[in-house]
Amino acid sequence: MDVGAIEYIHSQLVAQRDEGKAVLLVSLELDEVMEVSDRILVMFEGEIVADLDPKRTTVQELGLYMAGSKREAAQ
């Protein structure tokens, strides 16, 4: 996709999110995930290993969860 199409899709996702609708975004582009998300669930080997607030985490920390190097404490 070209940059214009990506920006359009992002704006539509954010608009839906801001209206209170659930939006599921599956992406390996961590900057994209951080930019458009208000909540991030990370799965590793079929299990949710983290429930993160993108305002309180870093791309590096997100990557560690994705790689299975880090897990949140059981809740």
Please place each PLM-identified region on the residue numbering.
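Glycine-rich phosphate-binding loops of nucleotide-dependent enzymes
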Residues: 1-75
